[in-house]
Amino acid sequence: MLLSSALCLVTSPAVHAAAPQDTPDLAPLAPVPVQRQLDWHDRRFYAFIHFGPNTFTAVEWGGGQEDPEVFQPGEMDARQWVRAFKTAGMSGVVITAKHHDGFCLWPSAVTEHDVASSSWRGGEGDVLADLSKACAAEGLWLGVYLSPWDRHEACYGTGEAYDDHFVTQLTEVLTGYGPIKEVWFDGACGEGPNGKRQVYDWPRYIATVREHQPDAVIFSDAGPDVRWCGNERAIGGETNWATLRRDEISVGTSKTAELNRGHADGTHWVPAEFNTSIRPGWFWKAGLDDGVKSLDVLMETYRASVGRGGNFLLNIPPDDRGLITDTDVARLAALGEVLDATYGRCALAALAEGGGVVARASNVRGGEARFAASQVLDPGRDTFWAVDDDHDPEGPVRAWAEWDLASPVTFDEVWLGEPIQLGQRVERFRVLCRGPEGRWKPIGAGTTIGPARGLTVGEQTTTGLRVEILGSQAAPALSRVSLYLSPPRVAIEPAGAVAVSPVEVSLSTRPGAVTRYTLDGSEPTVDSPVAEGPVRVDRSLTLRARAFDGRGASPFPAEAIYRVLGPDDWKAATQFLVPPTPGLRARLYEGGWQTLDQMEGRAPLETRDAPGFDIGLATRAEQCAIAFEGFLNVPEDGLFTFATASDDGSRLFIDGDLVVENDGLHGMDRRAGKVALRAGFHALRVEWFNSRGGAGLQVRWAGPGVGAEVPIPADALFR
């Protein structure tokens, strides 16, 4: 909502409701975006879909020789995909219509490497048609990824013949599936089935898009409309110019640092798109649900992409059923809740609606209300604060604007924006708020702003805000100043425990919010108990908590699992008539394993005696494994912590029960577990393997009679 001009006070000249012709409009600073790029900026956050034969073969880059019959998404439901994306607040979707393997997700007239050659849906399936209809039904836009690299097509690498082939496929996609808003060109250029590389005819490809879908932006490393961000983590540079010296950048460039930050003296408007995947890899693979990015990681990625002037393209691949997994659907829904709870209400604009904001500035262009500092409270780019071209800077400050607040406002994020239809100008800025003593205190600073710049500033409560422009390529202008307060969280301490006696648990949140909790694993509601002091946990249970404030329940859940051990949970010691012999038995294996489950049923090559956990006994440095077996002499009754640090995987068992799970391919990672043991001997088994590369194993413990965590000594090991 715009404030009336009466609320905007300026030092000089006075604001007046002048006719628009009294003061020249702010002149554009070239280069500026064209309309299709402005429309792209408004899309902000959308989905990437990698789907095809790779979904069924568990590879990232197919070789082009896949049998189309492997493509069998028997439960495919594009409407389910789109609805999941919509819950996250996404505006559209880009799908890999053709990846490097050359397989087409639509029935193409110029290849048999496509959905029509699969028995899926009797050879009548068309993924693009399904997705186009789903997007139209749910109000999302559609974009397509079409790889010019084709590892299947025989004419790839022959020049014009392949260009004709690719343009035909591009035309099929652009003319058969309704409006296409983005065309995504991958820069990969490898060898085809004939061992040759193709020199892509980019001008022809671009002209084809312009002919059939003139409103679509074209993405590649070099644009021409949108550029890659230079990494696959979707992390933007602290400095991010939407402008680029485009003629210096080619598709497949190694200038990733330049792509990440852009060029301050760019010749063309080519903003950055930031892409990453919600799970490991671009295509779905079984068993990787634990690798799905957390809410915190997704939110930080959003801030590092959208909050640094780009758009966020998040890959969510369908599984081999043709569905978005339940794990991903739930994560997207939770992300949508957090985004809405964080950015759905601007604290500054809400106060302004009641007339509670008074704006002033170092200068207002022509003294006209249409350029007043109050205009930034409407986040649209068509209303903005601007200064005169000849505005004299005050020391290091090129221009400043302030907003006095009638009542205190609490926030932890500040977002700024420029009217990018007139170019990108700001080079340096800082944000200040009024402290309790009435003085301005800096809370954040940055370089570029562009279409959006978000700053995380820690929780602040203030009655005044000030933005200073410290450097600008031309007369500065701001179209947005927004204040947001992220939803409250609950801190649980300790965050889970295994204990032999009751645990006192502290639940805390920020002032102004209350914590409600349950002890039966159910979701806390407004009727759940309020945590007004420590919560006593005297049995094994799952504690769940959630913060509530004036906006309702926070979208951030908190959970901790406690195991309070009873008499039946203690492991009794093994009694020996004859004392065991010091040391362990080491069973040695060979094999190209990826998990320790592959050890089961295998016979060792040999068995040796070992004084401890010595992986130097392995028969070779790679593709090897060892199982150490014996007994551990526990000095006292108590709760013990066991840990392994290993490269690659390891597991530790006590009396046949798994205590430490550290399996899989990884570097030197540490995992730990706890168990209650009676004094005496306990059966011990430690498994370890190495696939390739570095190798290592450490086995440690802590507890009564041991003290802080140390390596298990040789004198505690027996066989």
What are these regions (language model features)?
Residues 485-582, 606-609, 613-618, 625-627, ...:
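Short, compositionally stereotyped local motifs that mark structural "simplifiers"
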Residues 468-474, 685-693:
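Short beta-strand-plus-loop segments that form exposed binding edges in beta-rich domains
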